[in-house]
């Protein structure tokens, strides 16, 4: 039985609790309101898509959830930890031990093999999986000893995903993970994310402007102009192979 199925037998626990979150940037004499009172939850084992156009506040929200940025006002908690009151060291430890990040660009170390790129994380994690196990989860068992230059874009992104999950995070935050890929390659990457969510029960948030990707989520959170405008539940989820764009 997978970890996700075990969780499903219990009442879903809240991983993130967000209330009235705002973020304002000062750009010279101009104030830019990236978030204008966002409220949401993310639950254990859930896959959520944060959907909206460029400038809607998706990346800002994800960065605050991941401890990469702080809110101007409002409240955000990871389980029972109030991140709005966390010190810099507490946020560093939170990012290091609890959150996995996947970005549009892979940021692999060119002089290291796929296995070695993943090991960079596992060597400092508290309870890591083996690099080989992480790479196997994303379908790269036979590419572990290849360098980034020997891998396709989709394969490099899957190495980045393996690196993110290798520390056994409770949360996986993905910022436009298919943004630099064609649709066929992007679907393979989404299949890796779906497998991780299903088999490991890792709460997963994917931000995208691609409406089609929303079909694979448990819930879709729509953002517009810094506000969460709508939340939809997918009663029937699509598999990545059913997505087209």
Model-derived regions, located:
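ABC-family P-loop ATPase nucleotide-binding domain
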Residues: 1-24, 229-245
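ABC family nucleotide-binding domain
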Residues: 14-223
């Amino acid at each position: 039985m997978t970890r996700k199925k075990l969780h499903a037998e219990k009442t879903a626990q809240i991983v993130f609790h967000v209330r009235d979150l705002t973020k304002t940037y000062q750009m010279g004499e101009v104030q830019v309101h990236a978030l204008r009172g966002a409220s949401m939850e993310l639950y254990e084992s859930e896959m959520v898509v944060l959907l909206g156009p460029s400038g809607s506040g998706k990346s800002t929200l994800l960065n605050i959830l991941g401890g990469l940025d702080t809110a101007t006002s409002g409240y955000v908690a990871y389980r029972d930890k109030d991140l709005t009151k966390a010190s810099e060291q507490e946020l560093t430890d939170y990012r290091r031990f609890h959150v996995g990040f996947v970005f549009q660009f892979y940021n692999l170390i060119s002089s290291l093999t796929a296995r070695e790129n993943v090991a960079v994380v596992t060597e400092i994690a508290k309870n890591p999986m083996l690099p080989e196990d992480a790479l196997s989860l994303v379908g790269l068992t036979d590419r572990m000893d290849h360098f980034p230059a020997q891998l396709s874009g989709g394969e490099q992104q899957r190495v980045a995903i393996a690196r993110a999950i290798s520390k056994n995070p409770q949360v996986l935050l993905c910022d436009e993970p298919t943004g630099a890929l064609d649709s066929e390659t992007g679907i393979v990457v989404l299949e890796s994310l779906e497998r991780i969510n299903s088999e490991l029960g890792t709460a997963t948030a994917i931000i995208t402007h691609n409406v089609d990707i929303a079909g694979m989520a448990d819930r879709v959170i729509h953002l517009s102009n810094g506000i969460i405008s709508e939340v939809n539940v997918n009663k029937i989820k699509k598999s990545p192979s059913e997505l087209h764009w």
